[in-house]
Amino acid sequence: MAPMLPPRRLRPFSAATATLALACSSAAHAATTSATGNASATVLTGAPSTVASTSGQGGRATTSTTATTSNTTPAGDAQPDADGVLSDHRYDHTTVTASPMNALRQSVGLSRMPHDAMHTPQNINVVPQVLMQQQNVKSLDEALKNVPGITASVGEGEGGMAGDQFLIRGFQSQNDIYENGLRDFGVYTRDSFDYDHVSVIKGPSSEVFGNGTTGGAINIVTKAPHLGNAYQANFSGGSGSYYRGTLDINQQLTNSIAFRLTGMGNENNVVGRDYIYSHRWGIAPSIAFGLGKKVSFVLEYFHQNDNRIPDYGVPVVYKPGQAIGRPVTEYGVRRTNWYGTTYDQDNSSDDMITGRLTAHVSPILTLYNDMRGGIFHRYFSASQEACSSMAAGTTAYNNNLINGSVPSATCNSDFFSANPASAQVARNGGVGGPEPYRQSDWSIQDVFSGVARFKTGRIRHEVIGGFDIEYVTDHRQNYAYGSNRASTSLLNPSMYVPGLVLGDCNQYPDRLVNISGVGKKCYKDSDALDVGFFLSDQVWFTDYLSVKAGFRWDNWNSHYSATGGDTAKYPDVHYGQDETTINPSVSIMYTPRSNLMVYFNWSQSTTPLSMYVTNSSEPMTAKSQSAAPERSSLYEIGAKYSAFHDRIGMTAALFRLDKSNSIQTDPTTGDISATSDQERNQGLELSISGTLLPNWMFYGTYALYDPTITKAGSSTSKQGGQIQYVPHNQATAWTSYEIAPRRPWNMTVGGGLTWRQGVWLDQANTARAPATVEFDAMVSHRFDNHWRVAMNAYNLDNRLNYGSLFSNRVTPSIGRSFLFNVSAQY
């Protein structure tokens, strides 16, 4: 029997964990920012990769852009390519001026999409490094708050069921997080200490990424070694016993070899939530060979260890006489209330090693091979609260009876009675799960691709092709409580449950959760193999008009087994699924100038139900193994304009996204299931980013959505209703201004707004979370060219907002908090 775990206590912060740094960006050639806040950058034309990176302090930034193209145009007869670049020589150098805040001039970050965001025919939101630095971003979740259409169901500081879980344009993207173009299979909360910038590719993108990407894909571009030496250390401290240190060292070893090391130590409580904390550390060394050469290779290792308390927030309740449920905190219950037990914990250890090879074989052909192996370990135990009014004899009531939570069956009515203190909340979600588990995964992926640029007569081509092989396996061992997990007070909860014992699943087999089609099982094993082939051709009929068409073929083969427990009552089960999919895309681009593009894009994506091997405890059941995959189609027309010598980037996109056989995620277990729902989200997305005036940076986005359930395939959906978690309106804005740059009394002041309209929490549109409004601010000062101090303030008016959203509960966001930061850069 596993011993009862003591209450988790905050460890004192170790000075060793604070040795540390936010990084100088990766760059092949560095350039120094001018007094206007713009940056000179060297552009190298020849190879089909684009790398844009920035590093800045208080509005002063360094940017380096390497944009590479080539063709076979003879010397003396040079013609501008689709990007407006003369490419009659393979290594032409041109100097341009760009703002490090201009998202359009950032790379997407993967070889299969070799152009920058400006020249990619799809709406792409890029969170540049200078923005993350000014906001003191510490996690992927915090970075993505700058992107419209992103909703977190689990995120940094809020904890939750399965690490980072995001929705893009209202659709699940839990398996659509990539790092340098390779899928990150891990289930953990991602720290941002090794980030250069983050790209969000909106809309179905299976032609590039393979299965998944219904709403889009998130691609993290990490810091990479570069020529030249750079050293930076950073320390933050503030509200919530917050202590954080980061380190970034880049060392040039030879004229073509460089080494880089980034590290992080972080300990914090969550302001505005009781007992929630995160203790984590990470390290990411990398070495690059062949910098500036025709053949280069980058080897990277990443490790992150995280011990945190998961937070399932507060329950939704229904006031008598009102049909719409709201978070219980909207009726005066304290936002700090946490309904977990001393057993709750989320401990993860994640390791990845990545190799990226680039070979410029000839002026017209470049080959890439990217490979990654990952090992992920996790122990997870959480309490999921529910406050309901249940009728005796129902399944929900009986589950409460089994788990000793009978008082919670009348929690809702008790709360609105004359004696609200009598309300008791269940800690098992009212449906008995999920049980604690230990998870071990490993994965491997290899993507080989080539980019060829050539002419057939007077028509130019850019052909991208290759193959993608990925394999992932997951093993879970469940645990069971030997006694009842009793309910607790809704108004004054306690984490202590006297006599509660957690044991091995074989010790208490009858205490396991009974999953339909699976039973009460002890061990769960799953694996999946995906083999994909992709090919596309962009054809320039004139210097300004081009058409790109492509497809990807995938074969997805997965298996799932549930074994152990009381096999006499619940026999072992074994399921499998084999899906072959073809996903096309077609784009039309009109580029009258290198800084202006108007485009149309049509693309499709496919998501097999068995795809979520590491993200779900039951990736397959008897019902879902034969279910058709989810299909999505995107129609998008947009324009991108980089104005005033690339100082300001502006985008506008109109889109319609249709999805059939919608996948739904169980709010308690995280298991996925198919319905015959058909959904449509259509709308408008706008963005502007860059340097508006000398020393004045701005980053703003807006989204207008019309998310509709066009066909309800089950009684839990409302035909004509609004898709859950998707607001009609959403906007973000951040601005900063540098006063008296390079003067002893210099100062940078900044601030921002995050606004999201209220959203429905379920497909039936019976529960709703109110609008989110958050005001943040920043002030910084530079002592010289090396030292900087800053103060960041978050949620200045201490508004009760909700970050992570579920169908029957929500997690309050952080309260008002302040972080002091000091950094040194040499």
Feature locations, PLM:
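Membrane-embedded beta-barrel scaffold of Gram-negative outer-membrane proteins
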Residues: 360, 366-372, 376-378, 382, ...
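C-terminal beta-signal and adjacent terminal beta-strands/loops
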Residues: 754-762, 768, 780-826
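Gram-negative outer-membrane beta-barrel transporters
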Residues: 543, 656-658, 674-763, 797
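Outer-membrane beta-barrel translocator/receptor signature
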Residues: 193-196, 207-285, 291-295, 351, ...
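Repeated loop/turn-to-beta-strand initiation elements of outer-membrane beta-barrel proteins
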Residues: 256-259, 294-297, 364-367, 458, ...
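Acidic, small-polar-rich N-terminal luminal/periplasmic segments of exported/outer-membrane proteins
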Residues: 55, 65, 85, 89-228, ...
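Structural signature of Gram-negative outer-membrane beta-barrels, strongest in the C-terminal barrel
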Residues: 288-292, 441, 460-472, 524-659, ...
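Acidic/polar loop-and-plug regions of large Gram-negative outer-membrane beta-barrel proteins
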Residues: 268-271, 283-360, 364, 374-441, ...
